[in-house]
Amino acid sequence: MSKQTFTTTFAGKPLVVEVGQVAKQANGATVVRYGDSTVLTAAVMSKKMATGDFFPLQVNYEEKMYAAGKFPGGFMKREGRPSTDATLTARLIDRPIRPMFAEGFRNEVQVINTVLSYDENASAPVAAMFGSSLALSISDIPFNGPIAGVQVGYIDGEFIINPDKEQMEASLLELTVAGSKEAINMVESGAKELSEDIMLEALLKGHQAIQELIAFQEQIVAVVGKEKAEVELLQVDADLQADIVAKYNVQLQKAVQVEEKKAREAATEAVKEMVKAEYEERYVEDENLATIMRDVAEILEQMEHAEVRRLITEDKIRPDGRKIDEIRPLDAVVDFLPKVHGSGLFTRGQTQALSVLTLAPMGETQIIDGLAPEYKKRFLHHYNFPQYSVGETGRYGAAGRREIGHGALGERALEQVLPSLEEFPYAIRLVAEVLESNGSSSQASICAGTLALMAGGVPIKAPVAGIAMGLISDGTNYTVLTDIQGLEDHFGDMDFKVAGTREGITALQMDIKIAGITPQILEEALAQAKKARFEILDVIEATIAEPHPELAPTAPKIDTIKIDVDKIKVVIGKGGETIDKIIAETGVKIDIDDEGNVSIYSSDQAAIDRTKEIIAGLVREAKVGEVYHAKVIRIEKFGAFVNLFDKTDALVHISEIAWTRTANVSDVLEVGEDVDVKVIKIDEKGRVDASMKALIPRPPKPEKKEEKHD
């Protein structure tokens, strides 16, 4: 296929798609140019079904530093593992396209997005999401798209689609919403305590804007789209399924209704093992035993799936016996750990998270050097999910995509209520350790984070709580669930996480397994989540109503002084010599920003006070009319040089020593002598003249003798 180009304008920027020129061996490939951002997307499918029991979709988002005209950092000077932002963007693209593949589709699919040029005012992630959908849609891969996504901002009561960098910095909302023509199927958002009504309107505005992008994709597919390949879907043997259902459905139904998680898991596993043992013995001589046993496992999974959903939709019974809108038992504890700067333990049913706060000087902020201009990140929220939290063994190592994503969600939820840098000049790190998990652990980490911040004396604007909502839908009827547990998440259609304060929402995240959800479901889920959020905030506020008035004794104390910008170089000194000397003498940490704010950190208040004294001396300026207790440092014929303070000297001219004539300076003053002087002049070069006689009362003039006349 020869190169074909398609052009439109979207949200005030040119959107250009090129097909047929590059990556022609992929099943589908596009080059998307949005503004000056350029993204190459290639989609590839394996020829055979994978052997696993899940859909092996892999989405990558690769940031090439040349796209922003930068050299990669580090010794190797080449791109390494994906950055946190790249990982989050890959997840952002994966989530809306995953539901658009058929049930039972098991071929491996890879969608690789490579950022070739970067424009900070034209979203490369949005272009990559568009390119991913389009590459799949024009390929022979059986993808039931297209989908598209947009960013939505909110400034002065107006919604803005795909805001530029300046607009996003002023926005009260940072929302990414994706979906198909019919419905929304992915949401990721941070917000500055916005109401449910505003958030819902933002979602609908975003979905409305998506229609234009989907129509553009459909236009392109009509011209260059390939015929979809016929692929084998995972299907179980109908006779085998009927046999197992008839024999064991009742037993499995009883097992599913055991309320306690561990007991329920043991009961369902016992039924499954019994069934597997029977059919393995029956077909042990069959050459297709592996396929039969795979079908048996899939049938049992489908039976459990169907029973959980039936109980909720028809009988309104949840696996643990709760009502549809009921939250599991809650518990909140602060100051769980000694020595640390703050800690909070939050428990919701069988989900438990411990959050630990660490405060540090601003010099500890994380430097982010990606495609965007380098910046410093003051607040970090890290999420850890050890396998023991679900009673299992498993991999231990660096954080995976899921842990990075959950940490970022908590970060967005909590950063909206943090004090400004001027109010609280600390770098802040929260680490969430999930100790138990039966669903909604990311939201438990948000609640625990609130407890840790308040226990640590961080003056947050308001407590934040999070709740996960679920959905069971048969296409006609649906049930929205409050505080979903693991089984409801696994077998449900939606995981909709909502975090916020009593004033409004600070973060949203939604993933679904069906094609999309309606505005009515969104509205109901947001209303139900608000009620639940307030219940959780009641428990948090009953435990700790306000942030502790003081920091922990182990936290670094801080004092801030302001100096003139032109004095920064004086405090730092040549090659950092002066500031290093201060730090060596006092043992403190010092941060100086470009505005002249000097932050001094130490656990020793006396060291802070001494540092302030030294810096004040360094930046102090002589003023006309002020009196100083000075020391004579040099004597010349024309006067004496005195040190007023630190590195500021002044000249006391011979005529300013006394009201009477001074013949020789050395007759009156000597080096090392302390004298009081008054500054009388500072010239344009900063040279200081001082006077001793100005502090001495001027003697009266001698009276003239009267002349006698004869």
UniProtKB/Swiss-Prot annotation:
Annotated S1 motif domain residues: 625-693
Keywords: Cytoplasm, Magnesium, Metal-binding, Nucleotidyltransferase, RNA-binding, Transferase
EC number assigned by the record: 2.7.7.8
CDD domains per the UniProt record, alphabetical: KH-I_PNPase, RNase_PH_PNPase_1, RNase_PH_PNPase_2
Basic and acidic residues composition bias: residue spans: 700-710
Pfam families registered for this protein in UniProt: KH_1, PNPase, RNase_PH, RNase_PH_C, S1
Coiled coil: none
Entry-linked InterPro entries: ExoRNase_PH_dom1 (IPR001247), ExoRNase_PH_dom2 (IPR015847), ExoRNase_PH_dom2_sf (IPR036345), KH_dom (IPR004087), KH_dom_type_1 (IPR004088), KH_dom_type_1_sf (IPR036612), NA-bd_OB-fold (IPR012340), PNPase (IPR012162)
Binding, Mg(2+): 489, 495
Listed cofactors: Mg(2+)
Top-level taxon in the UniProt lineage: Bacteria
PROSITE patterns: KH_TYPE_1, S1
Family of the protein in this entry: Belongs to the polyribonucleotide nucleotidyltransferase family.
UniProt xrefs under NCBIfam families: polynuc_phos (TIGR03591), PRK11824.1 (NF008805)
Name of the protein this chain belongs to: Polyribonucleotide nucleotidyltransferase
Gene name of the encoded protein: pnp
